[in-house]
Swiss-Prot record:
<comment type="function">
    <text>Acts in concert with MON1A, as a guanine exchange factor (GEF) for RAB7, promotes the exchange of GDP to GTP, converting it from an inactive GDP-bound form into an active GTP-bound form.</text>
</comment>
<dbReference type="Pfam" id="PF19031">
    <property type="entry name" value="Intu_longin_1"/>
</dbReference>
<dbReference type="InterPro" id="IPR013176">
    <property type="entry name" value="Ccz1"/>
</dbReference>
<keyword id="KW-0472">Membrane</keyword>
<dbReference type="Pfam" id="PF19033">
    <property type="entry name" value="Intu_longin_3"/>
</dbReference>
<dbReference type="GO" id="GO:0016192">
    <property type="term" value="P:vesicle-mediated transport"/>
</dbReference>
<feature type="modified residue" description="Phosphoserine">
    <location>
        <position position="264"/>
    </location>
</feature>
<dbReference type="GO" id="GO:0005085">
    <property type="term" value="F:guanyl-nucleotide exchange factor activity"/>
</dbReference>
<comment type="similarity">
    <text>Belongs to the CCZ1 family.</text>
</comment>
<keyword id="KW-0458">Lysosome</keyword>
<keyword id="KW-0007">Acetylation</keyword>
<keyword id="KW-0344">Guanine-nucleotide releasing factor</keyword>
<dbReference type="Pfam" id="PF19032">
    <property type="entry name" value="Intu_longin_2"/>
</dbReference>
<dbReference type="InterPro" id="IPR043987">
    <property type="entry name" value="CCZ1/INTU/HSP4_longin_1"/>
</dbReference>
<feature type="modified residue" description="Phosphoserine">
    <location>
        <position position="74"/>
    </location>
</feature>
<dbReference type="GO" id="GO:0035658">
    <property type="term" value="C:Mon1-Ccz1 complex"/>
</dbReference>
<comment type="subunit">
    <text>Interacts with MON1A. Found in a complex with RMC1, CCZ1 MON1A and MON1B.</text>
</comment>
Length: 480
């Protein structure tokens, strides 16, 4: 449990809290500088770069020693994390001999002592290993999505090219890590699916088939509405990381311009009176500009076998977004972009308003417009489906939760217990703040519920959770 806030009086007024922070992040390969005097060659990327050379070498050497030492006890899975009073180090070996290390400062509480001096207390137990190990794995997955594997860079241009790619990517990416708001959802890395009735789903399926037929170069398609996934032709693991990029980086960057010009179609004078709200989120900004650049980001998928490099076209109309992925060897011209815009724009606009209408009807019928009665997180390991009423809208910089961090920590602790047990189980915890926290693990699914009935007993809590399962998950089997 987290340390309780200071009591009333001067102590409380003078207590300052500092969240966890990234101290350093580096990538090294011990094979690249095996002899004395060559140690610097091992370091492929180091943040912050201002750190003196000898200190970088010393820190990497220490990590090597820790990995070697732990390998004695666990040859296949050496070091995962190292706990110290002030910080915690996380280790990941995503490819053979390539090590990524992330050092996170523990949260701090600073108090004033009676003689006016600042007393610093490090909250050593606050960070959850599983959460930050998952964040470190995400760093690699996101790099791989846009650059391919470390080995691919070595094949393309040796260590020099790998260093350039790492510098270019991580220099920007590390600024987007908001370690203070990482939690259980980072462990799951799941996908939020949009709830749809059968008819609307068939309309979307039919739209995708038509688009793939009209634009024959399209290899894979993904369809999202309201930042939630409806359809994807990609493998699950590739989609989960692309989904994270879209929902935490690309879409939030385009929200502001959208709000500014929401009420006017992009081109109202379409033939046949079809309105057209479509626009590119990646690629050309203005299709009428003959000088417009048709550059799209490239992504790498199926890196374990076929290793495909693709152009990523993200096109949006109102709240619907469609991703078209095209082989990177296919040249994309301004004419192609105009053709895509004229085919996809009007149809996607109509489809987006159909989905919106149907969604609002379903919302009225189910009465789901009201504040959710239960605060819960659900995750299905089989299809990566994730649902949370605890997390409010993610902003580009932070994921907002509607519950106290202490309760989020308990959820993480329950998840760690689930990981250690193979069989299905249920854990019920009464928090210091009188909330009840329930975790259920059943048949590859996990459900976490927070209840605020302070005077309830175990039997009543169990009944409430059953009620939640019946209303929210009526078609899902949870063991009692």
């Amino acid at each position: 449990m987290a340390a309780a806030a200071a009591g009333p009086g001067a102590w409380a007024a003078q207590e300052k809290q500092f969240p966890p922070a990234l101290l350093s992040f580096f990538i090294y390969n011990p094979r690249f500088g095996p002899r004395e005097g060559e140690e610097e060659n091992k370091i492929l990327f180091y943040h912050p770069n201002e750190v003196e050379k000898n200190e970088k070498i010393r820190n990497v050497g220490l990590c090597e020693a820790i990995v070697q030492f732990t390998r004695t006890f666990s040859p296949s899975k050496p070091a995962k994390s190292l706990h110290t009073q002030k910080n915690r180090q996380f280790f990941n070996e995503p490819e053979e001999n390539f090590w990524m290390v992330m050092v996170v400062r523990n949260p701090i509480i600073e108090k004033q002592s009676k003689d006016g001096k600042a007393v610093v207390e490090y909250q050593e137990e606050e960070l959850l290993d599983k959460v930050y190990s998952s964040v470190l794995q995400q760093c690699y997955s996101m790099y791989k999505l846009f650059n391919g594997t470390f080995l691919k860079a070595m094949e393309d241009g040796g260590v020099k090219l790998l260093k350039e790619r790492l510098e270019k990517f991580f220099h920007r990416y590390l600024q987007t890590l908001h370690l203070q708001s990482c939690d259980l959802l980072d462990i799951f890395g799941g996908i939020s699916f949009f709830p749809l009735d059968k008819m609307t789903y068939l309309k979307i399926q039919s739209f995708i088939n038509r688009m793939e037929e009209s634009l024959s170069v399209v290899k894979y398609t993904a369809f999202l509405y309201n930042d939630q996934l409806i359809w994807s032709g990609l493998e699950q693991d590739d989609m989960r990381i692309l989904y994270k990029y879209l929902t935490t980086s690309l879409f939030p960057r385009h929200i502001e311009p959208e709000l500014a010009g929401r009420d006017s179609p992009v081109r109202a004078e379409m033939p046949g009176n079809l309105q057209h709200y479509g626009r590119f989120l990646t690629g050309p900004l203005n299709l009428n500009d003959p000088e417009a650049k048709c550059r799209f980001p490239k992504i790498f998928v199926n890196t374990d076998d076929t290793y495909e490099e693709l152009h990523l076209i993200v096109y949006k109309a109102m709240s619907a977004a469609v991703c078209f992925m095209i082989d990177a060897s296919t040249p994309l011209t301004l004419d192609f972009c105009r053709r895509l815009d004229s085919i996809v724009g009007p149809q996607l606009t109509v489809l987006a308003s159909d989905i919106c209408e149907q969604f609002n009807i379903n919302k009225r019928i189910s009465g789901s417009e009201k504040e959710p009665q239960f605060k819960f997180i659900y995750f299905n390991h089989m299809n990566l489906a994730e649902k949370s009423t605890i997390h409010m809208r993610k902003t580009p910089s932070v994921s907002l939760t509607s519950v106290h961090p202490d309760l989020m920590k308990i959820l993480g602790d329950i998840n760690s217990d689930f990981t250690r047990a193979d069989e299905d189980e249920e854990i019920i915890v009464k928090a210091m703040s009188d909330y009840w926290v329930v975790g259920k693990k059943s048949d590859q699914r996990e459900l976490y519920v927070i209840l605020s009935q302070k005077n309830a007993n175990l039997i009543e809590v169990n009944e409430e959770v059953k009620k939640l399962c019946a209303t929210q998950f009526n078609n899902i089997f949870f063991l009692d």
